[in-house]
Regions:
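Active-site and donor-binding regions of nucleotide-sugar-utilizing enzymes
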Residues: 47-136
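Membrane-proximal basic amphipathic "stem/tether" segments
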Residues: 1-50, 55
Length: 136
């Protein structure tokens, strides 16, 4: 294989790489547009707070302690997002709503929560509105 063939192969790989990234970016922009349209019809509840720790993997870290502090105040509706919410029956007995990460219920609570407390990054395809506060 000569140098020209190697360069051509690399260009093809780069083109594929750029095409994949561009496709992902287009999908992300389309999803944000759809969710922004949906968010227009879902009112933000001033007393609702959505929590998530480590992309929904557990009830831990700063979000846990913030929610533990706030659960004593009945004026707030606390929602937790988990990859698997079944093991968290104790939270439900305490009046905390648990939802499955990525479910329709999760998207509803995400769009309707006044405050979003995550210890990781927001999903790139989900917009926050001007009425929402994101705490990381």
């Amino acid at each position: 294989m000569n140098l020209r063939e190697i360069k051509n192969k690399l260009r093809k790989v780069k083109a594929v790489y750029l095409a994949i990234n561009f496709g992902g970016l287009c999908a992300q922009v389309a999803a944000r547009t759809v969710f922004r349209g949906i968010a227009f019809f879902i009112p933000v509840k001033k007393n609702r707070i959505l929590f998530r720790a480590y992309e929904g993997r557990g009830y831990t870290c700063s979000p846990k302690y913030i929610s533990e502090y706030m659960k004593n105040d009945d004026t707030y509706e606390i929602v937790w997002s988990f990859n698997n919410p079944e093991p968290y029956d104790e939270l439900r007995r305490q009046g905390i709503i648990t939802v499955k990460q990525g479910s329709l219920q999760y998207f509803y609570y995400y769009l309707s929560s006044k405050v979003i407390v995550f210890n990781d990054l927001l999903e790139a395809f989900l917009p926050t509105t001007g009425n929402q506060v994101y705490i990381n």
